[in-house]
Each structure stands twice: as structure tokens, then as C-alpha cells.
Amino acid sequence: MESKKKAIYVHGLGSGAASTTIDIVRKVFSDYEWTPVEVNEDPVDSVNIINHTIGQLHPALLMGTSLGGLYLMYADMDSCEDNAIRFIFNPACDIARVIRETIGFGTKEYFVPRLDGIQEYVLDESVCARFENFIAGYQPTSGKRDYAMFSIKDELIGPAGVRNNQRVCYEAGYRILLDWEGGHRLRCQTLRLSRTHLFDERKTKYRVGDRVLFKTSEPGEHFLRYYGEGGPMDPRARRKEEFVGAIKSIYLESTPQLYYAVTVAPLSSFYCSFVSEKDIMRLATEEDLGRLC
């Protein structure tokens, strides 16, 4: 019998290798042999732990949530299996802000028993500075198949944070996906949708020149023209009705719970000036698109 491919999972802040999320991951991706990696609040130490595990296992799939997603952005992809998939959920790219504004300072208790035996950790200004210095001093690594999924209703990161983190991941080369229903915590349903519509490659790419209908919070239909991978952005097309630009990736997805993001490159004032934080682009149904192509 053929052995299973190796995979690693990296948990979020305040958790550990015994996170209950790994049970969901194992159930949905049962054809992989999963190893949970326990990390901490020190980014340099945590990334070293991840890279040590990668060097031992050479995984074909890397998955991380929240802070674990951020750490995986700096993982040693060269030591992974060739063509490995890196999939991060709600990465906490602005973790220092989240700690200051949402989580708060103080002594915290880990949600689960830890392998290192430590059950409490401290969040303070020095921890925030450590995260900020790490992000400023290191560059995310590049992979061949990098994906980042964001929950639109992420209550921990917040709407502005989600938009900022999408930009960070996009600029790092990730394909951006949206979960329209979930919150910050990874849902089993989100994982199942991801497997069906991402890992099985069940998606349809648009033709160059297609007009793609998307929804915004403003009335009326708005369109984006697909110019193909790496096409130049046209600075003259500064009308809300039609965004013209280089599309990182456009995929058709009619499942109500999961939408592939339509992303204009580069994410800049051109993009942000016409799309408010409420207007995260959402693809229409296949029926709507059929009338346009």
C-alpha cells in the first residue's frame, strides 16, 4: 500500500500541538499523514521549529491558522516536497495590532495542554515589538502553490485588518480566497470546501477579454475585464463600472459559501479608492457570468 504524503499543521496564538483543529484537519485531509507543530510567541524561534520539522519530513502540504499562518509565510519551502501546497487561513499578518487592540496585554492561559509543559504566556509591549521587528526584518518565502483564505466575518482581525492582510499575502505571491460565512476560527465546512474546490483543481479559468461581473455594496452591476496573467494596468480606466488591470487569478466558483477573490494588481490607491472596506469583491453565479461571456 502506498504511504501517505507528509503534512504539517501550525496552530494559532494561545494554542498548541493538541489543538482540536488538527482533528478536523486530519478528518478532512485523511489521505495525508499529519504532524502538528507546536510554536510560541517568539517568531524567530517558532519559524526555526517549523523549518526543523520541514527538514525532517519534507511535507507535501503545509497548513496554518492565524499566527500559525503568519509563521508559515516564512517557512523553508525549498526543503518541502517539490510542488508542495502551502495553505494559510486568516493569517495574523498584523498580530501586534491585534494584541494591542483586541486581545489585550497580560498573563494568558493556553487553551490546550502544551508539549513543552508551559500553561501560561505573557503578552505585553515587548512581545508586540518582537513581532514587528521580525516582520520588518524578514521577507516571506516563495512557494509554487501558495494560497491564503480569509473569512470576511473575521471578528478578531476586523474588516480593515482583513483587507490589509489580503494585500500582504497578495504581494507575497499568494492566491487569495474568501470564506463568506466563517469567522476567525477555522470551520470544518471551510476545509471541506477548500478540498473540493482547491486541491481537486475543480475550477474554471476565464478567457482573456472576458467581462467578469462582481457585486459591491453599491447598486448596479460592476465589471472587471480579464487581461490575463501579468497584463499591464491601464491607469485611464478610473471608472467604478470597469476595473482594468492585471489579474493575479480569476476563478469561477458558484458555491454560496466560498468565493474566489478577484484581485487587481497592484493593490494600490487605484484599487482602494474605488472599493470600500464593505466592497470586498464577490463573484456572481455561473448563470450571471454566462450572460456576459
Model feature map: region roles:
Residues 252-293:
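Intrinsically disordered, low-complexity, charged/polar segments
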Residues 74-78:
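Active-site signature of alpha/beta-hydrolase-fold catalytic machinery across serine-
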Residues 2-57, 184:
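Active-site catalytic motif of lipid deacylating hydrolases and related acyltransferases
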Residues 203-232:
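Short coil-to-beta transition motif at edge beta-strands of beta-rich domains
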Residues 63-72:
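Gly/Ala-rich beta-loop-alpha elbow adjacent to hydrolase catalytic centers
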